[in-house]
């Protein structure tokens, strides 16, 4: 299970940055919750490893379509990336599968078309956010044992740098709120992301 990692480039001379889509590389979606579902019923749950690999066993009843779902949520520590403009739904990618021994490779793409984002294909962003948070948490955990509280990160392509109703994407700027104990991250194309 992988996502498109797009490096950021900063120019000291122009004091501006951009994303280098021509340098995109696939990276593993690590320690993420992965599920086999039959319709809306969860048949099996597990986690990807550090290489984005997984193995799940399940018994299907045959009553619905089978799918493999990878959530933008890690298992330890628990970090999840939600869409604050869609009822706090956890971001995910999925694909259909069949019964029996199945290999299914899922990939979250960046959705950049060369001039703009295709919103239906912009699935890498929440996994890139998740991977950055997971990398930071792991860095702390390698120094000494740390018990992290569950962290909720709110990202949406509708999050803009305007104050107002966060459920509508008006988050002001990327920030942590101590009242909610959650992080909000800008996501609107061309709006300080």
Stretches with model-predicted labels:
Residues 147-165:
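Long, charged, glycine-rich C-terminal linkers/tails
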Residues 57-59, 77-80, 107-152:
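Zn2+-dependent metallopeptidase catalytic core
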Residues 4-39:
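Short, ordered, surface-exposed loop/turn motifs in non-cytosolic proteins
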Residues 75-112:
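Structured interaction patches on ligand/partner-binding surfaces of diverse proteins
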Residues 38-53:
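Short, acidic Ser/Thr/Gly-rich low-complexity loop/linker segments typical of extracellular
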């Amino acid at each position: 299970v992988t996502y498109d990692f797009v490096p950021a480039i900063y120019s000291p001379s122009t004091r501006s940055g951009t994303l280098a889509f021509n340098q995109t590389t696939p990276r593993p979606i690590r320690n993420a919750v992965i599920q086999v579902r039959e319709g809306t019923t969860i048949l099996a749950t597990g986690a990807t490893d550090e290489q984005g690999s997984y193995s799940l066993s399940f018994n299907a009843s045959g009553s619905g379509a089978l799918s493999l779902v990878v959530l933008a949520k890690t298992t330890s520590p628990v970090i999840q990336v939600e869409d604050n403009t869609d009822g706090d739904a956890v971001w995910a990618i999925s694909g259909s599968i069949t019964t029996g021994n199945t290999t299914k490779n899922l990939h979250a793409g960046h959705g950049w078309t060369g001039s703009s984002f295709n919103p239906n294909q912009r699935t890498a962003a929440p996994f890139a956010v998740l991977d950055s948070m997971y990398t930071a948490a792991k860095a702390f955990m390698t120094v000494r044992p740390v018990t992290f509280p569950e962290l909720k990160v709110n990202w949406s392509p509708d999050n803009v740098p305007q104050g107002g109703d966060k459920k509508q994407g008006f988050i002001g700027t990327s920030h942590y709120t101590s009242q909610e104990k959650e992080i909000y991250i800008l996501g609107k194309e061309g709006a300080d992301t």
